[in-house]
């Protein structure tokens, strides 16, 4: 059927995988462009056409070749929201957890000069600030944790229940 599923549908769930791939390749501008197309109530998917609440990350919406163009299906039965959260926090903002540590490796649009995120992880609170005066899309020039320089981009988990400040310079 034209304009449904993989046959010409804007597939939001798959779009989140593209965001991750773009970030892994250092393409912050492309990653952000995709996010703006699949976010709820985006210009390409206005809620007054989709029949979906304007705050719901949907699985897909019918493409232009389908008689139901713009309508959405499976708004509440999809992993798209979880993958969107993961794509943004772990890959764009670069807070990627592992067992005893996390890496900080942001991939952001070149016109973002600064972005912040607060993340609670294993009982600790991390306030992450990404500074991008150079207009880079990826790469870490300098990383500090609680004012102390860190070699590389891996941070050991504190496990102390406190708040820690991370500053990333791209």
What positions do the PLM features span?
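Non-catalytic C-terminal accessory modules of carbohydrate-active enzymes
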Residues: 1-6, 10, 17-170
């Amino acid at each position: 059927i034209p304009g449904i599923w993989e046959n010409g549908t804007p597939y939001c769930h798959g779009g989140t995988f593209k965001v991750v791939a773009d970030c892994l390749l250092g393409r912050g501008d492309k990653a952000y462009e995709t996010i703006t197309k699949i976010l709820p109530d985006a210009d390409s998917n206005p809620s007054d056409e989709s029949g979906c609440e304007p705050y719901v990350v949907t699985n897909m919406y019918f493409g232009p070749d389908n008689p139901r163009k713009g309508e959405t299906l499976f708004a509440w039965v999809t992993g798209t929201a979880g993958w969107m959260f993961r794509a943004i926090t772990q890959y764009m903002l670069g807070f990627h957890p592992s067992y005893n540590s996390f890496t900080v490796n942001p991939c952001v649009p070149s016109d973002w000069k600064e972005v912040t995120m607060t993340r609670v992880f294993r009982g600790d609170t991390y306030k992450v600030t990404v500074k991008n005066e150079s207009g880079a899309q990826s790469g870490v020039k300098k990383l500090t944790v609680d004012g102390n320089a860190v070699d590389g981009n891996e941070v050991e988990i504190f496990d102390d229940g406190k708040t820690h400040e991370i500053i990333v310079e791209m």
